[in-house]
Amino acid sequence: MPKVKGITVGEELAMLKEKLSGAGVDSAAVNAEQILGKAANLDRSEIFLNMEMELAANEARKAEKLLKRRLKGEPLQYIMGTTEFFGLPYHVDESVLIPRPETECLVEWSLELLTKNDSPKILDIGTGSGAIAVALAAHKPEAEFIAFDKSLKALKLAAENSRMNDVREQIQFVVGDLFKEDFIFSVGKNFDMIVCNPPYIAEGEMADLQTEIKDYEPRDALTDGADGLVFFRRLIEVVPKLTKPGGWCLVETAAERGSEALAIMRKVLPGAELRCDLAGRPRMVGGQFKR
């Protein structure tokens, strides 16, 4: 009996694109390439150089399983297990928020302010995947970091990301709760900079989010369960105790509440300002602490 011909790389790629596009998935071609690449252990160039190559049966089955996950709404980054932020690779899973391009603007602002400080002491509150701390450490090799989060699972992933990017020795990972009395004792004082990407989505806005966000990313990293400003109110309580005179505090916020976040932060950082992301939306608030 003649052997039944299997599906080729090119045929599988076309099928994946068609199903993803038909389901309304954005960037269907990119999604298809990454899913096929993971299933067949091929990078993008290898896919296009081997379009006539026959896929092994187990590779085709794996591609189908990955496709089903994506069609249900699971973020591509979780399916792949990796993403990129500020030009660096990161492992991600459902224990951490997927790093966003707009947060790179917060990193750029931080580096801009630290130009004349080669060895700053920096606190990253709610580090998650470690995206901000790792990116800053990669550009400030003499800096010292405390990366703080209430999730031990997230901190383990962040530590893995710091090792992958060769900055593990610069970062101390601390588990705890920003809202507990022992928070300051657990992280220390005299920081040159505090950076934070807090949960800033209001509880009432959660239902309007995309499925791949609200059903897959950690809820505690998205919303404070209230008006999206709870963390800002807590930050102004601790910033004066944590920051040395002349130190900075930079926080990401929702564009819809930028002015409200600014008003809160100005209670302890009178010169605080709003910065916009690349789309021109007011997404960051920051200022210098002066006793």
Go through each PLM region and give its residues:
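Conserved Class I SAM-dependent methyltransferase catalytic core
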Residues: 226-288
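Helix-to-beta-strand junctions that scaffold the AdoMet/dcAdoMet cofactor pocket
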Residues: 167, 217, 243-245
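Residue-level signal for inorganic ion chemistry
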Residues: 35, 73, 103, 132, ...
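Mobile active-site "lid"/loop adjacent to the S-adenosyl-L-methionine
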Residues: 200-231
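Conserved SAM/SAH cofactor-binding pocket of Class I
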Residues: 101-208
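Non-catalytic accessory regions of SAM-dependent methyltransferases
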Residues: 1-40, 46-48, 52-53
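Conserved AdoMet
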Residues: 36-112
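Conserved hydrophobic residues forming the short capping helix/wall of the S-adenosyl-L-methionine
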Residues: 20, 114, 162, 239, ...
